[in-house]
Amino acid sequence: MPVSLSTALRVVGTSLFALAVLGGILAAYVTGYQFIHTEKHYLSFGLYGAILGLHLFIQSLFAFLEHRRMRAERQPVRLGRSVALCIAAYQEDPDYLKKCLLSVKRIAFPDLKVVMVVDGNGPDDTYMLDIFHDVMGSERAGSYVWRSNFHARGEGETEAGLQEGLAHVQALVRSTTYSCILQKWGGKREVMYTAFRALGDSVDYIQVCDSDTVLDPACTAEMLRILEADPRVGGVGGDVQVWRRGGDGTHGGTALALVALTPSPPQILNKYDSWISFLSSVRYWMAFNVERACQSYFGCVQCISGPLGMYRNALLQQFLEDWYHQTFLGTKCSFGDDRHLTNRVLSLGYQTKYTARSRCLTETPTRYLRWLNQQTRWSKSYFREWLYNALWFHKHHLWMTYESVVTGFFPFFLIATVIQLFYRGRIWNILLFLLTVQLVGIIKATYACFLRGSAEMIFVSLYALLYMSSLLPAKMFAIATINKSGWGTSGRRTIVVNFVGLLPVSVWAAVLLGGLAYTAYSQDLLSDTEVAFLISGAVLYACYWVALLTLYLAMVARRCGKRKEQCGLVFAEV
């Protein structure tokens, strides 16, 4: 069969499958078909709930199978390949940057080239260059303060000076083991482009890393193992995890005892700094070890995260210019860099994978507003890249199509459900919905406790409320402002508070409170049965929160603020 005809058939088939999935979910939602229900429908179980439950079960099953496959991996790592680690830095907290660079020096991989590019070349940025020299060693490190960047001249820069700077940056990066470039501000994508362009085809693989990331010594070798094992894989991402300290304070076992096969507890650098950073840590674990692990089973991980990822350089150089010059609705894109990098790999028909054996620590916002801004930025890139990703459904497993449809449209179904319940239902319907949300959260949390082997994962169920109250309106706001660009969150050295993110949350809260008041006012008098259900449901809901908050105070709150223990890692020591 001709290639063009085969491709056309796959496009048609995949498109029909996507429409069938969406149509099936929509039909189940609209018809409201119920398998079982009590008299007057106080309790019921319908087709729509069954579909969502089946989705969670299948996703969890394939995630489990992928973890089992990861643990069984025994193929030796070929250390003869050349790898460059590219670090993107912007107004980084000095302590985080130092920890990042110290962990880089401890990576167990021979002749690893390190390129750090700083987004900014002013007096307020030079402290990062000083830290780079202090940690990496001035005798092996080269540096250059560039007045320009690859796409914009610095103030007073001539064309000849620009070309001289370009040549100097490329020569420096290719000739030195450790190099640090300070360049004219241009955003994270500009920083990444400089590192990729300067390296050219001088290495086989490129590893990416953010300046707030602490890397496990085996992370590079473990990602390389995946890429070397299958030429169809174009990129691989790792996990945010902790490697346990050995009893003598050295690496627990051999240097490439390679991330113990028994799952150790994932963590974030500032996990216990606040309630929001703690909940983010358990959410990160679910995102990586369930959602992305499932995607990895089918070779279609849709986002290789910036803190820890590796790509085939030959592929990266192939789409570098298209990646950098990406536009959306006529506007140049300057966020979603990592997701679009992953999408470019997928667009070429290559697989993307995830390995829990490659680990790192990263920083997450500790304040609600900064976290909200971060989530809004990520949601913008998700919806924009969803449209781009849909162009390549036919090149990959049907799971990629199915999951994209389900996760892409789920927020809209959820909003429609909430508004309908709050404005057209009864008080009991609203309470039952809240109970159902938490029940699903508890089921997911129980599975996470089993998979990870940690009781802390029970707090995944708390994240459900955060999703309903904050993430849902943030996603809608992200769609409304999808073309507004920027880093989205400020640098960590100077935190800038942005109150814009509160607008959609406030509007959403007003909508819900208004609906609750309207329903309470307009509904008929409650029957004795409904009163009994309301009292029972309210008591059950209150008991749930009392139990979870008690556990939180006992297990988590007492540790908040004790950042010292976060540095007690083999690869995070200072």
From Swiss-Prot:
Gene behind the chain: HAS3
Alphabetized GO MF terms: hyaluronan synthase activity
Membrane-traversing stretches: 16-36, 45-65, 399-419, 430-450, 457-477, 495-515, 531-551
Modified how: O-GlcNAcylation increases the hyaluronan synthase activity, HAS3 stability and its plasma membrane residence. The concentration of UDP-GlcNAc controls the level of O-GlcNAc modification.
Domain of life assignment: Eukaryota
A Pfam family the protein falls into: Glyco_tranf_2_3
Membrane association type: Multi-pass membrane protein
Cited function: Catalyzes the addition of GlcNAc or GlcUA monosaccharides to the nascent hyaluronan polymer. Therefore, it is essential to hyaluronan synthesis a major component of most extracellular matrices that has a structural role in tissues architectures and regulates cell adhesion, migration and differentiation. This is one of three isoenzymes responsible for cellular hyaluronan synthesis.
GO BP annotations listed: extracellular matrix assembly; hyaluronan biosynthetic process; polysaccharide biosynthetic process
Subcellular location: Cell membrane; Golgi apparatus membrane; Golgi apparatus, trans-Golgi network membrane; Cytoplasmic vesicle
Swiss-Prot/TrEMBL catalytic activity: [hyaluronan](n) + UDP-N-acetyl-alpha-D-glucosamine = N-acetyl-beta-D-glucosaminyl-(1->4)-[hyaluronan](n) + UDP + H(+); N-acetyl-beta-D-glucosaminyl-(1->4)-[hyaluronan](n) + UDP-alpha-D-glucuronate = [hyaluronan](n+1) + UDP + H(+)
Record topology, Cytoplasmic segments: 1-15, 66-398, 451-456, 516-530
Key words of the record: Cell membrane, Cytoplasmic vesicle, Glycosyltransferase, Golgi apparatus, Membrane, Transferase, Transmembrane, Transmembrane helix
Gene3D superfamilies noted in UniProt: Spore Coat Polysaccharide Biosynthesis Protein SpsA, Chain A
Cofactor(s) required for function per UniProt: Mg(2+)
Pathway: Glycan biosynthesis; hyaluronan biosynthesis
InterPro entries for this protein: Nucleotide-diphossugar_trans
Family in the record: Belongs to the NodC/HAS family.
SUPFAM superfamilies in alphabetical order: Nucleotide-diphospho-sugar transferases
Species of the source: Gallus gallus
UniProt EC number: 2.4.1.212
Gene Ontology terms: cellular component: cytoplasmic vesicle; Golgi membrane; plasma membrane
Sequence ranges on the Extracellular membrane side: 37-44, 420-429, 478-494, 552-574
Name of protein: Hyaluronan synthase 3
EC class: transferase
